[in-house]
Amino acid sequence: MTGIIIAAAVVSIVGLILGLFLGFMGKKFAVEVDQKEIDVRAELPGNNCGGCGYAGCDALAKAIAAGEAEVGACPVGGEPVAKKIAAIMGSEVGDSKRMTAFVKCAGDCEKAKENYHYTGVQDCTVMPFVPNGGSKACTYGCMGYGSCVKACPFDAIHIVNGIAVVDKEKCKACGKCVATCPRHLIELIPYDAKQVVKCASKDKGKDVMSVCQTGCIGCMMCTKQCEFGAITVENNIAHIDLSLIHI
């Protein structure tokens, strides 16, 4: 009986000593957490999409609290979240425009010529390994196999009649689809942009017309019609400088 009591006492004393030691070490090596970082993190939506350029919401919160990122850096939260974070940081929200993803192709199944019917893996990233880079005759357009659809965390992009179509209302401009498209057909543009070029072909006009009914042929008529001088034609494709367009 005495042995049991002694053993229990020894265990208790050892536990007490270890507890005190751990408590001391915890205080000595404790990492101070900025309360602003905690408050900012609480306002971020938590999607961890990476659209802000940081690894996730935790990393962005730390950067904002340290003054290394703008209060409006979260594309998902938008202006409402930016205002809340600005209040926490004691700053103001800068001018920002709502952005949305845009697919530079209108060559759907009805307008774009197909060389053959493809029934293989439905993934745009494997197309460089199949004949002609995919079934469509145009080697610049949307392949329509949905790599961008899989990448979107907001269900904002779908394949409709053979091409990717963005739902502007759902799009949070996180940029994941932009990074995923192997043909670099997707870019972020202002949400309210009305003048766009839905083509990326660099082929000459005659070649474009032979594979697509709606492709840009580089005729330069748009450059002559634009009163703002915002449209240029380079490599047989029209480009619009949206900063020069007065909507």
Enumerate the language-model features and the residues they cover:
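Ferredoxin-type iron-sulfur electron-transfer modules and their immediate structural context
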Residues: T2-Q225, G229-T232
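Conserved small/polar residues in nucleotide/adenosyl-binding loops
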Residues: I245-I247
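A generic structural motif
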Residues: A164-D167, I237-D241
